[in-house]
Curated annotation (Swiss-Prot):
Location of the protein in the cell: Golgi apparatus, trans-Golgi network membrane; Cell membrane
Gene Ontology cellular component list: plasma membrane; trans-Golgi network
Record has Lipoprotein as a keyword: no
Binding-site positions, Cu(+) 6: 565, 568
Membrane topology field: Multi-pass membrane protein
Official protein name in the record: Copper-transporting ATPase 1
Main location: Golgi
Top enzyme category: translocase
Length: 1476
C-alpha cells in the first residue's frame, strides 16, 4: 500500500452564501468528494477551509467544485499550507486470528485518517492521523471487537517514553535530522530506515526535526543508522546517547567509587531497599531533553532506585540507598550528565526511611534535613460532561495515573480539581488524559502553581519564610468571556461590573456595551464561568459563557520578508512559540506570510513584530482593505460601463444600417403606392439597393455586415449574462439573465439559421434577419445595469461614510511615572493594544474608543451620534473611535480596540440591517421566483397565438406589421411577426425592478437613520414601526434622567448653632459609605457645595433597609477650615471688584457681595453621632417630628420626591429632598407622538405617587405603576392582544424582556451606550425626540417602498400586453429594442425613487416647539389614569421570580424613604399574590 502522508489545507473565499443552509450544502457536497479529509465553511468570514489529499485534489479543482454549485469562489492564495499529522502505534493484544483487511478498510473510511501501515508479524498498526480531526480515543472506538493498546510515539516527559517503546534487548535512540521541509521528507525517512534490519520502530517529527528510533544494538549500530539517514540527503546528529543500561565513560571517570553494572545485570535489575529520599535543585535545564537525559542516566547507578525530575520546579527527587551513596555523590553524578553544564544543590529535603541507617551515612547528611513531600493542586475546566457517569469515568481514569493523589469533578461547575505530585506528573499531562477520553479540557492561565506542604516532619520550622508564604498564596488568574444580552445603557454596565467585583474569586470585570460582551478575570479554584454567568442572570440580564471567545482577538497575519529557506521558517516558528502567550505560529515560505494565534492580555502584535525583527527579518501587517469599494460598486460600475461601450461601439453601425433600410423601405413603399408598381418591379428595385446586393447567392452585404457586427456583442458584450444564466439554470432556477440570454440567443440563432438556409438554397431574395436585435438589447440592458449600480452605490453612501471615519494610524506615546512624555511612535491602528496611551492632536481622528487621561478639548461626534454641537472632553471623559478632535491635544487610554470599538459595531449593525429582508421583500422574492417561468410561457404562447392568427387571417398581420414587405413570403412574414412579438415579451419583462423595490429603500433608510444617530436593525423593524399604535415609555432613565439629584436642603436649626456648611460636611461624610442611589446623590451634592473631593471619617456605619443609616463622623474640621479659606478668598476678590473711586478703604470693603462671615476655626477633632432616614427611623430612635416638618415631607412625597431627615447628636437638623428630574424634551416628544395619532403610556416599577407626578409633568394620561419586571412583558402582551402594535422605549435592566416582546423595541443610549441585543431600534443619543424621528422615518420609508412597487407593476401589467401585441388595433406596438429600453428604465427608476429618501431630514423641532407651545402643558393629577400593578391580568400571573423578589424588596426599601406615614414593611413581608 502506497502511503499518503501529504496533507494540505487551503482557504477559499466564497461569495453568495446567505444562510446556514448554504453552509451545510457546501460542506455536505464538497465533503463527499474523493480525497477531502475535512471542510469548515464560515458564513461570517465568507470562506471555506478544506483539508485534503494533494494527490487527489488541487486548490483549483476545489474552487471549481464550489463554483459549480452556484457560488462565487475566489482563491486568493494558490499555495496550500501543510497540515501537521501524527502517527499512532497500536499494538494488538488479542490472541485471535485478526481480520487485518477489515481493520484497514474500517479505519481508512474515517475522516482524519490519512495512512495505515500494518505489521502482522509484530501485531502492530501504524495509523497516521490529523490530530485536529480525529484522536486516539476515537480510533480505538472504531474497532470495538479488538482490545488495542496505545504504544504510540507520543511526546512524554522523562524516561517513561523510552522504556514504554523499548522491549528487553532494545535501545531507544534520538537523532537530530535537519533539512526536512514537509511530511514527504518524514514519510520517506520512516519508510527507508524502518526497513533496515534491527530497526523495530521509528517516528520522525517534522516540528522538532528529530527521529526517535527503537533498535536492537546487536543487529545494527548507531553509526549505521546515522549514515543511512545522511545518505538520504539529511544531515544527522545523535541528539541523545543510546540508553544502554550502564554509565558512559565520562560518568565512570567521575564516579570512580560507584560500582557500574554490566549489561546483563541491567536487564534483570536487583531491587534495593529505598532508604532515603533527597530533593535537589538543578539549574541549567532548558527543555524536556534535559529532563530525559538526567532521568535516563542517574538510575544506572547501582544504589539509585528512582528519580523524578520536574522542569517547571527545576528540581529532582531521588530515592537511593543511604548506606552506599551520599547526596554529595548524587550531586556529582547529576553534574556529570551530558552536556555537563548543570548546577546542582541539595534542597535540604532528605527523608530517611531505613529502620537502622548507618551512623556514618547520618553524619554525612546535614543536620537540618527534613521530610517535606510536595503536593500541588490544579483546576481543569472540562466541557462535554452530561451526567454523573461522565464524572465517575473521569475520576476513575485520572485517579489511576501515577502521581495523582486525589481528584474531584464538579458536573454543575464543569471543572475538576486534581491534587498531584508535581515530580511525577504535570497539569498538561492530566489535561491530555481527559482530552483522550473524549472531553474538552482547558487549563487556566496560571502564573504560579498553588503549593501545599503535606505531612511536615517534626523538624519542619513552625514559622515558614515570607517567600514561602508568598508562593503559597500566589493568585491563579484565568479569563473568560460572557455574552451579555439586555444591556441598554452605561448604568447596566456599571451595575454588572460593580456587583461582579464583590463576588469572591473575581479580580476584574470589563463590560463592552456595544459588543454585548463581558471579560472577567477570576480564580478558577474559587469560581467558574458558569457560576459567573448565573450571577449576571440574577441581575436581570441574559448571560452565556462564550467558548473560544478570545481566539478572534488574538489572530495576527504578518508579511515576513528576508526568509530564504526552511531553516528561516523553523527559526521564526520555534522562537515565537517559546514566548509566553503565543499559542500557535505557522510561517509559509512560499507566500512570506505568518499566521499567529496569541493571548492579547500577555503579548501584543507590536511585541511579536519586534521579536521577528530581532531575528533579522522584516515583519509587517497584512494590509486590509479599509476602503468601501464593495459598497460603492466600483467594480460592477466599471464592468457594466465597459460592456455598454463595447455594445454601443458595434450597435451604432447596426442602428445606422437599420435606419437606412427603413428609410429606403419607406421610399419604395411610397413609389409603389403612387405608381401602382407590380410586385416583380418592387422586388427588382429592392434588390438593386447597394446593401441588398448579394456577395454570394443568399448572402447580402446588409446581412453580412449585420452578422459581423452582432458577433462580438453577442459573445463578448453578453459573456457575463451567459455565465449567470448558466449558473441559474444549473441549479434549476431562473432570473433576469435567463430572459435576456433567451431573447438574444433565439434572435441570433434564428437569423443565422435562415441565413444559412438561404445560402444553401442559393435564394435570389435576401432573407429578413434579426441580427440588429441582440446589439440593441445589450446596449440598453448594459446601460440600465450601469446606471443601476451607480444608483446602488449611492444607497450605501451612509455606510461608506461610517467606514471612512475609521482612522488608519495612531500615535502611541510612552510616559514616565510623572506622566512626562518620553517617546512617540506612529503605528497602524490594528497594532494598538488595550491600555496603550494614544496622543490625538487637534484635527485628528480618535483611532479607538478610550478614556481621556490628560488634556481638555472639544470633540466633533456629529458623524457618529448625529449631535451637531461639539462635546467637551476632560480627564475621565470617554471618546469614540472616528470622532474628530478640535482644539486641544488629548492623551487617551485605549479601552476598546479593533472590532470592539463603537464605530466597528455600528458599521457591523448597519451592514447586517441593510442585508436583512423586510416581510414585504420576502413576498416580492417569492413572486420573483415564479415570474421568469411565467414570462417564458407567455412568450411561447404569444409566438403560437400569432402564428395561428397569421395563417387564419393574414390581413391582421399585413395591416399591423410595421416592417411588412411584399418582397417576402407570407409564411416568413407571419413567423417573423410572431417571433418579434415573443422576443419583445421576453425583453420587456423585468423581475429586477420587483426585487429592487424593498432592499434599495431599506438600504437608504437605514443609512439615513445611521447618519441621524438612529440605528435600525434591518427591514422588519423599519417596516413595523409605521404600524405602531401605542408607544410605551419606561420612566427611570427614559422620561427622566435616571440619576437622582438633591432638589432641596432645608436647615431646621439656627445657623449660629450648626452652620449649613457643617451640616453638609457631616451628611456628605455619613452618606459616602452608603451604596444607595439616594445616598450617592447626597454625597455628590455635598462635595459640589463644599467644592471638595475629600470628606471626613465615618465609623460604626450601619444601614437598616427601608429605614436609614446611623454612624459616627469625625475629622471634618480640616474640611470646614479649607472651605472657610475659599470663602475668604472669594470675599477678597469680590471686595476688590467694588473698590471704584473709593476714598475710604474701610467703607469700600463692606460690600454686600461678601458671602459668609468667617467661622471659628476649630482645631479639636470632634465626634458627631448621625442618623439619616425616614420618619419611622427617627421615631425608632426616640426623636419627635414637628407638624411643619411632617407637612413638608408629605408635600414632597406628593410630588414624587423622596425626603430624608438628618439628626446630629440627637437633634433634628435638616430635611433633604431628592428627585429624578424629567428630561427637557420629554413633554414635547409626548405631545408630538399624540399629534401623530399614537397612544402614549407610562410604565414604571416606581410607586404610584411618583409615577403620577412624572406623568403630569410630561402630559401622559395613562400610567401603569408598580409594575414588576415580568409583568412589563405581560402588560405589553396584553396591549398586543387588544390588536395594537406596541413600541416599547426603555433603557433599564428590567426593560429588556419587554423590549423583546414589543413589536418594536427602542433602546436609548448616550454616546457609546448603544445596545446590540435588546432592541430593534437603537438611539446613539439620549434624546426622546428621536422616537418621533424613527417613526417618521419608518413611515417615509414604507411609503417609498410602496411607490417602488408601483413602478414594476405598471411596467409589467401594461408593458407585457403591449409587447404581446394586444393593443395593435389602437396602434401600440413595441420593437424588441424598445422593450429592453423599457425594462432598463424600470430598474433605474426604482433605484432613483429610493434615492429620494436621501433628501429626508429629521423634523425641525424648533418649529414643532413654536407650533405646539400653546397646546402643550402639564396635566392635573385628576386627568391621569393610574393602574397599580398589572390590574386584571393578576389572576393569571405566575409566582414572583428571583429578580421580581429583589425588585420588590428594593422598592419597599426606596419607597419607605418617602413621606407616607405608614410602614411599607408589610409589602415586603406579605406574600405578593396581588402583585401590588
Amino acid at each position: 500500500m502506497e502511503p499518503s502522508m501529504d496533507v494540505n489545507s487551503v482557504t477559499i473565499s466564497v461569495e453568495g452564501m446567505t444562510c446556514i443552509s448554504c453552509v451545510r450544502t457546501i460542506e455536505q457536497k464538497i465533503g463527499k468528494e474523493n480525497g477531502i479529509h475535512h471542510i469548515k465553511v464560515s458564513l461570517e468570514e465568507k470562506s471555506a477551509t478544506i483539508i485534503y489529499d494533494p494527490k487527489l485534489q488541487t486548490p483549483k479543482t476545489l474552487q471549481e467544485a464550489i463554483d459549480d454549485m452556484g457560488f462565487d469562489a475566489l482563491l486568493h492564495n494558490a499555495n496550500p499550507l501543510p497540515v501537521l499529522t501524527d502517527t499512532l502505534f497500536l499494538t494488538v493484544t488479542a490472541s485471535l486470528t485478526l481480520p487485518w483487511d477489515h481493520i484497514q478498510s474500517t479505519l481508512l473510511k474515517t475522516k482524519g485518517v490519512t495512512d495505515i501501515k500494518i505489521f502482522p508479524q509484530k501485531r502492530t498498526l501504524a495509523v497516521t492521523i490529523i490530530p485536529s480531526i480525529v484522536n486516539a480515543n476515537q480510533i480505538k472506538e472504531l474497532v470495538p471487537e479488538l482490545s488495542l493498546e496505545t504504544g504510540t510515539l507520543e511526546k512524554r516527559s522523562g524516561a517513561c517514553e523510552d522504556h514504554s517503546m523499548a522491549q528487553a534487548g532494545e535501545v531507544v535512540l534520538k537523532i537530530k535530522v535537519e533539512g526536512m521541509t514537509c511530511h514527504s521528507c518524514t514519510s520517506t525517512t520512516e519508510g527507508k530506515i524502518g526497513k533496515l534490519q534491527g530497526v523495530q520502530r521509528i517516528k520522525v517529527s517534522l516540528d522538532n526535526q528529530e527521529a526517535t528510533i527503537v533498535y536492537q544494538p546487536h543487529l545494527i549500530s548507531v553509526e549505521e543508522i546515522k549514515k543511512q539517514i545522511e545518505a538520504m540527503g539529511f544531515p544527522a546528529f545523535v541528539k541523545k546517547q543510546p540508553k544502554y543500561l550502564k554509565l558512559g565513560a565520562i560518568d565512570v571517570e567521575r564516579l570512580k567509587n560507584t560500582p557500574v553494572k554490566s549489561l546483563e545485570g541491567s536487564q534483570q535489575r536487583p531491587s534495593y531497599p529505598s532508604d532515603s529520599t533527597a530533593t535537589f535543585i538543578i539549574e541549567g535545564m532548558h527543555c524536556k531533553s534535559c529532563v530525559s537525559n538526567i532521568e535516563s542516566a542517574l538510575p544506572t547507578l547501582q544504589y539509585v532506585s528512582s528519580i523524578a525530575v520536574s522542569l517547571e520546579n527545576r528540581s529532582a527527587i531521588v530515592k537511593y540507598n543511604a548506606s552506599s551513596v551520599t547526596p554529595e555523590m548524587l550531586i556529582k553524578a547529576i553534574e556529570a550528565v551530558s552536556p555537563g553544564q548543570y548546577r546542582v544543590s541539595i534542597a535540604n529535603e532528605v527523608e530517611s526511611t531505613s529502620s537502622s541507617p548507618s551512623s556514618s551515612s547520618l553524619q554525612k547528611m546535614p543536620l537540618n534535613v527534613v521530610s517535606q513531600p510536595l503536593t500541588q493542586e490544579t483546576v481543569i475546566n472540562i466541557s462535554g460532561m452530561t451526567c454523573n457517569s461522565c464524572v465517575q469515568s473521569i475520576e476513575g481514569v485520572v485517579s489511576k495515573k501515577p502521581g495523582v493523589k486525589s481528584i474531584h469533578v464538579s458536573l454543575a461547575n464543569s471543572f475538576g480539581t486534581v491534587e498531584y505530585d508535581p515530580l511525577l506528573t504535570a497539569p498538561e499531562t492530566l489535561r491530555e488524559v481527559i482530552v483522550d477520553m473524549g472531553f474538552d479540557a482547558v487549563l487556566p492561565d496560571m502564573s504560579e502553581p498553588l503549593v501545599v506542604i503535606a505531612q511536615p516532619s517534626l523538624e519542619t520550622p513552625l514559622l515558614p519564610s515570607t517567600n514561602d508564604q508568598d508562593n503559597m498564596m500566589t493568585a491563579v488568574h484565568s479569563k473568560c468571556y460572557i455574552q451579555v444580552s439586555g444591556m441598554t445603557c452605561a448604568s447596566c454596565v456599571a451595575n454588572i461590573e460593580r456587583n461582579l467585583r464583590r463576588e469572591e474569586g473575581i479580580y476584574s470585570v470589563l463590560v463592552a456595551l456595544m459588543a454585548g460582551k463581558a471579560e472577567v478575570r477570576y480564580n478558577p479554584a474559587v469560581i467558574q464561568p458558569p457560576v459567573i454567568a448565573e450571577f449576571i442572570r440574577e441581575l436581570g440580564f441574559g448571560a452565556t459563557v462564550m467558548e473560544n471567545a478570545d481566539e478572534g482577538d488574538g489572530i495576527l497575519k504578518l508579511v515576513v520578508r528576508g526568509m530564504t529557506c526552511a531553516s528561516c521558517v523553523h527559526k521564526i516558528e520555534s522562537t515565537l512559540t517559546k514566548h509566553k502567550g503565543i499559542f500557535y505560529c505557522s510561517v509559509a515560505l512560499a507566500t512570506n506570510k505568518a499566521h499567529i494565534k496569541y493571548d492579547p492580555e500577555i503579548i501584543g502584535p507590536r511585541d511579536i513584530i519586534h521579536t521577528i525583527g530581532s531575528l533579522g527579518f522584516e515583519a509587517s501587517l497584512v494590509k486590509k482593505d479599509r476602503s468601501a469599494s464593495h459598497l460603492d460598486h466600483k467594480r460592477e460600475i466599471k464592468q457594466w460601463r465597459s460592456s455598454f461601450l463595447v455594445s454601443l461601439f458595434f450597435c451604432t453601425p447596426v442602428m445606422g444600417l437599420m435606419m437606412y433600410m427603413m428609410a429606403m423601405e419607406h421610399h419604395f413603399a411610397t413609389i409603389h403606392h403612387n405608381q401602382s408598381m407590380s410586385n416583380e418591379e418592387m422586388i427588382k428595385n429592392h434588390s438593386s439597393m447597394f446593401l441588398e446586393r448579394q456577395i454570394l447567392p443568399g448572402l447580402s452585404i446588409m446581412n453580412l455586415l449585420s452578422l459581423l457586427l452582432c458577433l462580438p456583442v453577442q459573445f463578448f458584450g453578453g459573456w457575463y449574462f451567459y455565465i449567470q444564466a448558466y449558473k441559474a439554470l444549473k441549479h434549476k432556477t431562473a432570473n433576469m439573465d435567463v430572459l435576456i440570454v433567451l431573447a438574444t440567443t433565439i434572435a441570433f440563432a434564428y437569423s443565422l439559421i435562415i441565413l444559412l438556409v438561404a445560402m444553401y438554397e442559393r435564394a435570389k431574395v435576401n432573407p429578413i434577419t434579426s441580427f440588429d436585435t441582440p446589439p440593441m438589447l445589450f446596449v440598453f440592458i448594459a446601460l440600465g445595469r450601469w446606471l443601476e449600480h451607480i444608483a446602488k452605490g449611492k444607497t450605501s453612501e451612509a455606510l461608506a461614510k461610517l467606514i471612512s471615519l475609521q482612522a488608519t494610524e495612531a500615535t502611541i506615546v510612552t510616559l514616565d511615572s510623572d506622566n512626562i512624555l518620553l517617546s512617540e511612535e506612529q503605528v497602524d491602528v490594528e497594532l494598538v493594544q488595550r491600555g496603550d496611551i494614544i496622543k490625538v492632536v487637534p484635527g485628528g481622528k480618535f483611532p479607538v474608543d478610550g478614556r481621556v487621561i490628560e488634556g481638555h478639548s472639544m470633540v466633533d461626534e456629529s458623524l457618529i451620534t448625529g449631535e451637531a454641537m461639539p462635546v467637551a472632553k476632560k480627564p475621565g471623559s470617554t471618546v469614540i473611535a472616528g470622532s474628530i478632535n478640535q482644539n486641544g491635544s488629548l492623551l487617551i487610554c485605549a479601552t476598546h480596540v479593533g472590532a470592539d470599538t463603537t464605530l466597528s459595531q455600528i458599521v457591523k449593525l448597519v451592514e447586517e440591517a441593510q442585508t436583512s429582508k423586510a416581510p414585504i421583500q420576502q413576498f416580492a422574492d417569492k413572486l420573483g421566483g415564479y415570474f421568469v417561468p411565467f414570462i417564458v410561457l407567455v412568450s411561447i404562447a404569444t409566438l403560437l397565438v400569432w402564428i395561428i392568427i397569421g395563417f387564419q387571417n393574414f390581413t391582421i398581420v399585413e395591416t399591423y406589421f410595421p416592417g411588412y414587405s411584399r418582397s417576402i413570403s407570407r409564411t416568413e412574414t407571419i413567423i417573423r411577426f410572431a417571433f418579434q412579438a415573443s422576443i419583445t415579451v421576453l425583453c420587456i419583462a423585468c423581475p429586477c425592478s420587483l426585487g429592487l423595490a424593498t432592499p434599495t429603500a431599506v438600504m437608504v433608510g437605514t443609512g439615513v437613520g445611521a447618519q441621524n444617530g438612529i440605528l435600525i436593525k434591518g427591514g422588519e423593524p423599519l417596516e413595523m414601526a409605521h404600524k405602531v399604535k401605542v408607544v410605551v415609555f419606561d420612566k427611570t432613565g427614559t422620561i427622566t434622567h435616571g440619576t437622582p439629584v438633591v432638589n432641596q436642603v432645608k436647615v431646621l436649626v439656627e445657623s449660629n448653632k450648626i452652620p449649613r456648611s457643617k451640616i453638609l460636611a457631616i451628611v456628605g461624610t455619613a452618606e459616602s459609605n452608603s451604596e444607595h442611589p439616594l445616598g450617592a446623590a447626597v454625597t455628590k451634592y455635598c462635595k459640589q457645595e463644599l467644592d471638595t473631593e475629600t470628606l471626613g471619617t465615618c465609623t460604626d456605619f450601619q444601614v437598616v433597609p427601608g429605614c436609614g443609616i446611623s454612624c459616627k463622623v469625625t475629622n471634618i474640621e480640616g474640611l470646614l477650615h479649607k472651605s472657610n479659606l475659599k470663602i475668604e478668598e472669594n470675599n477678597t476678590k469680590n471686595a476688590s471688584l467694588v473698590q471704584i473711586d473709593a476714598i475710604n478703604e474701610q467703607s469700600s470693603t463692606s460690600s454686600s457681595m461678601i458671602i459668609d462671615a468667617p467661622l471659628s476655626n476649630a482645631v479639636d477633632t470632634q465626634q458627631y453621632k448621625v442618623l439619616i432616614g425616614n420618619r419611622e427611623w427617627m421615631i425608632r430612635n426616640g426623636l419627635v417630628i414637628s407638624n411643619d416638618v411632617d407637612d413638608s415631607m408629605i408635600d414632597h412625597g406628593r410630588k414624587g420626591r423622596p425626603a430624608v431627615l438628618v439628626t446630629i447628636d440627637d437633634e433634628l437638623c435638616g430635611l433633604i429632598a431628592i428627585a429624578d428630574t424629567v428630561k427637557p424634551e420629554a413633554e414635547l416628544a409626548v405631545h408630538i407622538l399624540k399629534s401623530m395619532g399614537l397612544e402614549v403610556v407610562l410604565m414604571t416599577g416606581d410607586n404610584s405617587k411618583t409615577a403620577r407626578s412624572i406623568a403630569s409633568q410630561v402630559g401622559i394620561t395613562k400610567v401603569f405603576a408598580e409594575v414588576l419586571p415580568s409583568h412589563k412583558v405581560a402588560k405589553v402582551k396584553q396591549l398586543q392582544e387588544e390588536g395594537k402594535r406596541v413600541a416599547m422605549v426603555g433603557d433599564g435592566i428590567n426593560d429588556s424582556p419587554a423590549l423583546a416582546m414589543a413589536n418594536v423595541g427602542i433602546a436609548i443610549g448616550t454616546g457609546t451606550d448603544v445596545t446590540i441585543e435588546a432592541a430593534d431600534v437603537v438611539f446613539i443619543r439620549n434624546d426622546l425626540l428621536d422616537v418621533v424621528a424613527s417613526i417618521d422615518l419608518s413611515r417615509k420609508t414604507v411609503k417609498r417602498i410602496r411607490i417602488n412597487f408601483l413602478f414594476p407593476l405598471i411596467y409589467n401589467l401594461v408593458g407585457i400586453p403591449i409587447a404581446a401585441g394586444v393593443f395593435l388595433p389602437i396602434g401600440l406596438v413595441f420593437q424588441p429594442w424598445m422593450g429592453s429600453a423599457a425594462m432598463a428604465a424600470s430598474s433605474v427608476s426604482v433605484v432613483l425613487s429610493s434615492l429620494f429618501l436621501k433628501l429626508y431630514r429629521k423634523p425641525t423641532y424648533d418649529n414643532y416647539e413654536l407650533r405646539t407651545r400653546s397646546h402643550t402643558g402639564q396635566r392635573s393629577p385628576s386627568e391621569i389614569s393610574v393602574h397599580v400593578g398589572i390590574d386584571d391580568a393578576s389572576r393569571n400571573s405566575p409566582r414572583l421570580g428571583l429578580l421580581d423578589r429583589i425588585v420588590n424588596y428594593s422598592r419597599a426599601s426606596i419607597n419607605s424613604l418617602l413621606s407616607d406615614k405608614r410602614s411599607l414593611n408589610s409589602v415586603v413581608n406579605s406574600e405578593p399574590d396581588k402583585h401590588s
